[in-house]
Structures are given as C-alpha cells and as structure tokens.
Amino acid sequence: MAGTAERMASNQKQVAISEFFEKNKHFLGFDSLTRSLITAVKEAVDNSLDACEEARILPDIRVKITKIDDKKNIVELQTEDNGPGIPKRSIEKVFGQLLFGSRFHAIRQSRGQQGIGITGVVMYSQLTTGRKTHVRSKIATETSAAIVDIGLDTRKNKATKTNEGRELWELPNGEMKEHGLEITCRTVSYTHLRA
C-alpha cells in the first residue's frame, strides 16, 4: 500500500491558473459564443469605469463591434476610454497575467476584484482566432501613446508581446489625446444577438 501512495503522489502536478482557465473557459463567462461577446464587452467597460472612478474622471467610453468574417463568425471588439491610461511597464501584466490587479485587498466591493476579467478576454480572443489583442495606452505625463499586441502564454501565465512601439494619438477632431486606453480584440460570436 505504501508504494501505491508514493506512486500516486509522484503523479500529481501543479497547473498554471491560466492553463486551468484555458480548459475551463466557462468559469470566466465564455461558455457560449453569444455570452462570450457580452462578457468581453462587460470586462472592458468595467475596467474603464473602475479606472475613471479611481482617477475621479467622468467616463467617456466608446464600444465598437464590427463583423470581420461572416463564415467564421469573427467579430472585432474595440473599446476606448478617457481614463488615466496604463503605464507601458504595466500593460503586459494587466492584459497578459491572470490574478494581477489592484482590487484584491480593497474593502469596498467593486465591479471586479479577481484580476481575471480582461486577461480572460485576451486569452479567449487568442484561443478562438489565433490573434493577439492590440492595446494603445496614453498617460498624461507622456507625449505619445504606448502600443503593443498582447497574447498569453497559458503554461507560464505570462504575456507574450509583439509590435511594441509608441505613436501620437490624434483624435478625429485633430486634437491630441491627453490620456486614455484603447483595446482591440477579435473573437468568435454568433452572427446576431437578440435585444
């Protein structure tokens, strides 16, 4: 019997939290195609609201959903806000590492506390379309916006980054964006949503 217990114990392995959620997407709200799009919108908007609230900024949030591929039911979700933005050094952790956030030890209940939401969206987008999520962030103390395409290495629970750079962020009216965040990802969804 002792040999059996030792053999069984030697077969036990620890799995990364991101690897667990990769196999159990329904825990993150990605259990159906329609709900996946709703979850992605909710997570992005919740993050925008939280950031604006914490920075004491009246939120101005734009959400755009565009159908990209009719045959594969791929849609592109783009959100933009006027929040404080995210410093370049923090972008990869915010979008590419599960259980990373600022609300774990908050006393007051907030929209999100787990540090899972937006990274779950990045992961789901990557798993369903093979594409990374494009992030553009501008903070008030910098003259240009940081840009990067973020994916998730689920085995290591770490971000994968490509196309890093900086660019000026000009608004449609010709003014320069002072601060804010823009996220663009693609996901698979049903061809229609019922109101």
Please describe what each predicted stretch is.
Residues 34-58, 122:
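Conserved ATP-binding N-box helix of the HATPase_c
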Residues 81:
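Acidic ATP/Mg2+-coordinating residue in the GHKL
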Residues 8-25:
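P-loop NTPase nucleotide-binding/switch module
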